Design a protein with these regions (language model features):
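Bacterial N-terminal signal peptides that target proteins for export
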Residues: 1-9
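N-terminal signal peptide c-region/cleavage motif recognized by signal peptidases
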Residues: 13-18
Length: 261
């Protein structure tokens, strides 16, 4: 991630959402200067079911997003480097929905009022068991041109807990310093900090760094920077002094629906 970032630190961002607006820092209907909503639908395929079975519902998903007027964007993430271990499988896939917090309120009301949408959810339930998690996201960096150039990307996620002897203001100051160094000198496309809210469970009080990469070359350029470019010391300082983190997982992501607002 953060190639050449202030002594080289690494780790953050999801693909925000952005179609350039000449007057505000906005992308795909979201003001990136404000916290926005991110919903994670974490899914485990049922025995005998595959991602191909779920993909057969994709056209209906797109139709209903249009029909119900959802001002939201939807990506499907499948594991590339997951935390899953033998006997402890990771999620089969995660559907990530992004938009303004207000759009989630209107969107859920419209979705649940649609008989076809309820029918679609029932069809999905026959293929996978899913749980919904709603979070807020703070965009730190969005390379708009790069984000708009492709519907596919790799996304890293790293869950962290603030160290007890560090205040939230001190942690924010650290992130501010990274952002200042990162914005114009990075091989990744986006960095968001995610704050779990509804359905958070034991993730309450934690935060997640999400970073988006255009391809594996960008991802491995960051890994090379960590290994050979001097970033390891800065990462070690962050982990020991500021936050205890689980380590990064990496997911392959593709848009199912893009809000063009």
């Amino acid at each position: 991630m953060f190639q050449r970032l202030i002594t080289g630190i690494a780790l953050f961002s999801l693909a925000a959402i952005a179609q350039a607006d000449n007057h505000t820092n906005a992308w795909r209907g979201v003001n990136l200067d404000q916290q926005f909503g991110i919903q994670f639908e974490v899914c485990q395929l049922k025995p005998g079911k595959t991602l191909d079975d779920m993909a057969k519902l994709n056209d209906e998903v797109r139709r209903l997003f249009d029909e119900t007027g959802l001002a939201l964007s939807l990506m499907r993430l499948t594991p590339m480097y997951s935390h899953g271990m033998p006997g402890e499988p990771a999620a089969s896939y995660i559907d990530v929905t992004m938009g303004t917090i207000e759009a989630f309120g209107t969107g859920w009301d419209n979705w649940l009022a649609s008989k076809d949408a309820v029918k679609l959810m029932a069809a999905s339930d026959k293929i996978a068991t899913c749980t919904f998690k709603f979070a807020r996201a703070i965009n730190r960096v969005a390379q708009i041109e790069a984000l708009d150039s492709t519907d596919d990307r790799l996304i890293s996620m790293n869950w962290c807990s603030k160290r007890d002897n560090v205040s939230w203001d001190q942690l924010k100051t650290k992130h501010d310093a990274w952002q200042a160094a990162y914005e114009n000198d990075s091989s990744s496309m986006a960095w968001n900090v995610v704050l779990p809210r509804l359905g958070a469970g034991n993730a309450h009080g934690r935060f997640m760094h999400m970073v988006s990469y255009a391809n594996a070359q960008q991802l491995m350029a960051n890994e090379n920077w960590v290994a050979n470019g001097g970033s390891a010391r800065a990462l070690g300082d962050y982990y020991s002094a500021y936050a205890a983190c689980d380590g990064e997982s990496v997911w392959s992501a593709s848009y199912l629906y893009k809000n063009e607002g």
